[in-house]
Amino acid sequence: MTTLEVVVVLITGDSAAAHSFGGFEFRSLAVPSRGSAEIAVWTVDVPEGGDGTPHRASKEEVFYVLSGSVTIQGQTASAGDAIVVPPNTELALTGGPARVLVATSVGIQGTLADGQTITPPWSL
């Protein structure tokens, strides 16, 4: 019988890299630069009256509201709710104040309304 060594990575919230974009604050949790190989997870703090940049994400995204409430495509989610957004669906995160946990696949890219494609730095 072969025994495989399993390596578990602890990523503390205090050590998460912080990024700002459009008045929103992102904190990278489980992303490739922190040890994740397939899944990317971060938090986003949405300010009161937050009006996110419209974009399309190349991968499915799951938004889990930790506190407050946000709206995506007319769907308002409060603490404990989740919104699943299929890939290539136009969306903008609005509302707040709120803290949201976002989960997606590694390699996600966003296409902005002007056609510019970006790789969100909080996903790396």
How would you name each of these model-derived features?
Residues 25, 37-42, 59-61, 66-68:
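A generic structural signal for short beta-strands and their flanking turns/coil linkers
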